[in-house]
Amino acid sequence: MTVNDAINLLSRNFSIDEAFLKAFIEVETGGQGFDPLTGKIIIQFEPAWFRKKEPYAPSGKWSLNGVERQKAEWEAFNDACKINEASAMESTSIGLGQVMGYHYKRLGYKDVYGMWYEAENDIYHQVLQLCQFLTTDLELMQAIARKDWHTIASIYNGKGYKELAEKLGREPYDISLKKAYEKHSN
């Protein structure tokens, strides 16, 4: 199943605007659920989340990770896995929608391993997890319906998303999302 096939099917099943899903996935991962070079799932390891889960963990590659290329993300993730695999998985956003692993219960999984297993298997499950995440947050769904890009960005990426974008020299998330939505809705 292609990304577009999964989006088309699941946007209808979950009553989510198809153009919004396409825009969201484009902004999050450029439409890539798997690294074309390695075939591994796209990840973003979050050291701050791992530190919350493992406050006494010794520093290492995991603690130095920023927003990096996939090779560096996987090195940091694998380093954290040596300390606590489940905590590392919960501290990492995965797949097309970059849903954080710690949301596994919210998505209906018994543990984080089940969430990762399905996301690593195929694109369909990555889009499914994103749809499950979106539809289990009423405030987020209301913001999507209103096309309230600032609120969507604040809920999904945190209230400091604009400051982070400025620090990284990137376009703010709300602006990127709005532009991508306009592109996909025409």
Question: What does each of the following model-derived ranges do?
Answer:
Residues 1-81:
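Export/targeting segments at the very N-terminus of extracytoplasmic proteins
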Residues 2-6, 12, 59-186:
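Non-catalytic cell-wall polysaccharide-engagement segments
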